[in-house]
């Protein structure tokens, strides 16, 4: 087949494709010596844009739709036709999977200086290497300590998902360039609970400091009229409140997430599956990444883990509460860890199930084991907590596949090295981790369309969400996975006009757009930071 026929076939193949332009990829085309001019002439005639020419290497770079490659391979003079692969700067910075999943890496935050997110949580470690360059102010509730310190680490993790700085360290957030304004209200100390009245006071503080979006990775099962009316008032003032749906893995409503004027956020994993701990209610509105979320924690409070067998490195996650340290020894199969195994001076390999992670580690420790590796009994990473149990050996979790591979190496005369070290970053699970993804996306979209109201942004997020699970809205994922670029495209196309009818019917009477206060008093109820049930997981 000659060049003319090949190009004619190619042009016919793509002429009916509406997605041909969007589907283009960059390829390296190397041709026979002396045939460069002929190949280039026909490519230009066919409408191709040649990106670069390497005359000394008899090659050029072109961008073509993927479906055209097979046709181009038939050109007689072509010796190499391969994709022009990307290369990256090698840095220690990681982009958490959630950033790309919600399309934050597809949208510029160059207009974010006009937006403010208020985070109500356990504080913000201002000295953190990935957070210190942000534009941030803060307040503290009585008795909770300084807002710029975080004894718990929860609030710092949330803040990192929203605004970790793009500085070649650690991670990046949804708005990573230090332009977004943050206001921190610290209502929790290291104990991780406060009252509903504290939350209302924190919300008032957010309003007083001009917040556009309020992020709350917290909640409790008892509703409060006083609290409900405060969020209705905030919504009427143009503020968008976002809260975690809850980590009970059931259908109970959690508050403030289940108030009509608050966006309730469910958690999904990297594969867009619903997290088994995520609440499923008729108030769930949007979903976001909440499983194995890597973000900032108080400096040195995180844990990094590594396991090597000879020169082979394996991915591992330090168990929450694990001691720091490095251990080496042989590898011993200890089953489920329910019965003694001969582990003196060695590392225990234990399967997840039946008893707690702490009990497995204690059994290993009692038999003289120097460290423990617990492998998952289902697909995926294993993130676990040892709780308050005093375990004195390093403990890590690995996937089911890594566990199976390690079992296959038990007979090898090799030394296993396991290390748990201090880190400024950590993997957390929970709807607490999903919530800042939605709050951050809301702020990012709003910064690109400041003419929209909070209701307009809310409806755009709903309309543009990626539908997951059942067709349409469902109790597990709401309208679906929040998407920044899709929401902006939706507004670009349709504007941000608000529909008259909202999906959620208001359960309480309103006057003039503000909540009518029907009651003069309400019980002050406790609420808490949201942690998943992994700390007590037995199987």
Model-based region annotation:
Residues 116, 121, 129, 239, ...:
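Extracellular S/T/G-rich loop segment that most often corresponds to the catalytic His/Ser-adjacent loop
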Residues 34-36, 86-87, 122-126, 166-168, ...:
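Acidic glycine-/aspartate-rich tracts in secreted/extracellular proteins
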């Amino acid at each position: 087949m000659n060049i003319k026929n090949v190009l004619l076939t190619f042009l016919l193949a793509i002429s009916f494709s509406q997605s041909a332009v969007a589907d283009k990829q960059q390829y390296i085309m190397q041709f026979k010596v002396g045939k460069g001019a002929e190949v280039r002439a026909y490519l230009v005639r066919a409408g191709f844009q040649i990106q670069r020419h390497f005359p000394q290497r008899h090659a050029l770079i072109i961008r073509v739709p993927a479906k055209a490659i097979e046709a181009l391979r038939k050109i007689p003079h072509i010796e190499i036709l391969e994709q022009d692969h990307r290369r990256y700067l090698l840095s220690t910075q990681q982009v958490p999977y959630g950033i790309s999943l919600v399309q934050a890496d597809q949208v510029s935050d160059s207009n974010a200086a006009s937006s403010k997110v208020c985070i109500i949580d356990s504080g913000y470690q201002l000295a953190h290497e990935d957070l210190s360059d942000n534009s941030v102010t803060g307040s503290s509730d009585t008795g909770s300590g300084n807002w710029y310190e975080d004894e718990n680490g929860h609030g710092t993790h949330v803040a990192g998902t929203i605004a970790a700085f793009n500085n070649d360290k650690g991670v990046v957030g949804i708005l990573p360039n230090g332009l977004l304004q943050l206001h921190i209200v610290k209502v929790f100390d290291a104990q991780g609970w406060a009252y509903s009245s504290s939350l209302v006071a924190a919300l008032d503080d957010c309003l007083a400091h001009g917040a556009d979006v309020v992020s709350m990775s917290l909640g409790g099962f008892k509703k409060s009229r006083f609290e409900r009316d405060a969020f209705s008032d905030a919504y009427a003032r143009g503020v968008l409140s976002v809260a975690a749906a809850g980590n009970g893995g059931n259908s109970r409503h959690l508050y403030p997430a289940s108030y009509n004027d608050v966006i309730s956020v469910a958690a999904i994993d990297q594969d867009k599956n619903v997290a088994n701990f995520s609440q499923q209610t008729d108030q769930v509105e949007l979903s976001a990444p909440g499983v194995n979320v890597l973000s900032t924690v108080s400096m040195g409070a995180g844990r990094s883990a590594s396991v090597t067998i000879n020169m082979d490195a394996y991915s591992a996650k330090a168990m929450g509460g694990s001691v720091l340290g490095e251990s080496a020894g042989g590898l011993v199969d200890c089953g489920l860890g329910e019965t003694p195994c001969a582990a003196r001076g060695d590392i225990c390999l234990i399967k997840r199930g039946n008893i707690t992670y702490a009990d497995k580690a204690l059994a290993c420790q009692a038999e003289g084991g120097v460290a423990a590796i617990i492998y998952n009994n289902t697909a995926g990473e294993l993130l676990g907590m040892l709780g308050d149990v005093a375990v004195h050996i390093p403990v890590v979790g690995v996937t089911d596949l890594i566990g199976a591979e390690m079992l296959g190496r038990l007979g090898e005369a090799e030394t296993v090295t396991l290390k748990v070290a201090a880190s400024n970053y950590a993997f957390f699970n929970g709807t607490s981790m999903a919530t800042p993804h939605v709050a951050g996306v809301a702020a990012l979209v709003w910064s690109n369309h400041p003419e929209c109201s909070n209701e307009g942004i809310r409806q755009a997020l709903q309309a543009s969400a990626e539908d997951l699970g059942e067709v349409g809205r469902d109790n597990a994922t709401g309208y679906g996975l929040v998407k920044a670029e899709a929401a902006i495209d939706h507004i670009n196309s349709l504007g941000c006009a608000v529909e008259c009818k909202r999906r959620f019917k208001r359960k309480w009477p309103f006057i003039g757009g503000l909540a009518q206060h029907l009651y003069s008093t309400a019980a002050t109820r406790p609420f808490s930071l949201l942690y998943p049930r992994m700390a007590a997981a037995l199987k």
